[in-house]
Amino acid sequence: DLGKGAVPGEKFEEMGRDFEEGLVIAKMLEDAGYDALDADVGCYDSWYWNHPPMYFEEGMYLPFNKRLKEKVSIPVLTAGRMDDPDLAVKAVREGATDLVALARPLMADSFIVEKIRKNRREEIRPCLSCQEGCIGRLKQYLHISCAVNPAACRERELELKPALKPRRIAVIGGGIGGCEAARVLRERGHEVTLYEESGQLGGKMRLAGAPDFKKDDLALVRWYEVQMDRLNIPVHFNTSIQEAEQLKWADAVILASGSGASTFDLGNCI
């Protein structure tokens, strides 16, 4: 239906240009002298295809672009959730695409290509395909950013500079907020110790990553685990901070003990 989406399993007809018409247009563009085709799927009437969110499959343009390559002789570029290095390499090697294009993954981690080249894949900060900082802000006419990398597109303004006076800082809470605070502080040269009441990092992000289409949420948790190891940040698991005396060694304390659920009263409407 025009301008509408559907939930999984719902039957509906998407409006817009169909694939066969797209192939005809692609050939016309090649004949007109185009050097390459950066081909994606969808149009303004089904815009979520252009910027596939988390519930779309990774590499969801590949079946279409593989058929496109059979119709044209110029290079074909493929984007659309192609940030998995193994998927990208396999797609090129198997002839599904000539080049892989990245946009949102570069906002999540601008060094993704360098890390792939140097075989440091575990250090790649994952894109969640959540649309919060990029497409979501763009639709509000705000400067784009990234939910997992607030410095995206503002690298000069938010550059991490060495602290003039390194301090000893305790971070209470090993969720995403606490881990990010610990990481940034350590990158700037502070001495950081992280305390987590449970036996693992990630907090409520682990619950958020329970659906199979949100596995990138768990990948972000894993990324923070790698960062804690890389930066040699001491993490005290199964430790509850109850008294200020426990942290008397610290110059400052950051409380990141977790978020609360938003609730609202529906009254008698159900």
Give the residues covered by each predicted segment.
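A conserved short coil-to-beta-strand element within the FAD-binding core of flavoproteins
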Residues: 236-248
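Flavin-dependent oxidoreductase catalytic cores
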Residues: 1-172, 176-192, 200, 260-265, ...
